[in-house]
Amino acid sequence: MSTFKMIPLIILLIPATAKADAQTCMAEAMYFEARSQGVLGMLAVGVVIRNRVDHPAYPSTVCGVVRQGRLSDGRVYKWQCQFTFYCDGKPEIPTDPEAWTTARSLAKIVLDSRLTMQGLENATHYHATTVQPTWARRFRPCKQIGEHIFYVSR
């Protein structure tokens, strides 16, 4: 096979791999951050991730957004990540097969469409109602879904 014929094959494989990685990163975040919040809660987390990908202040990939907080040498400081599950010291192993299947399906929907949710069109942050992070004062609350409060820039 000539080099010329191999180039299109390589070009076609890169996006498919990147898309699979993006779906896994998105599904993990939706699952670990909001599986107890049902479909709407998981979708809301996915919308926030996609909003960040589209925003110039954040990484331009889903995995980059989800993993933001990892140091360049690969270390992670506990509780210093943008998404708590990623640096809580626990392994990311789904234990609820039904919720994991739902998260994978919802991640595909969020990634393959321009799905948005009313009130979350520009949301880039959220937190659980059980905490009051200091960063929240710098943002405007825009919606509560389940046990999460979502925010937009002021």
Give residue spans per PLM region:
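Sec-dependent signal peptide recognition
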Residues: M1-I10
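Bacterial extracytoplasmic/cell-wall-associated proteins, especially those involved in peptidoglycan
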Residues: D21-R154
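N-terminal signal peptide c-region/cleavage motif recognized by signal peptidases
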Residues: L13-T17
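Cleavable N-terminal signal peptides
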Residues: I7-P8, A18-A20
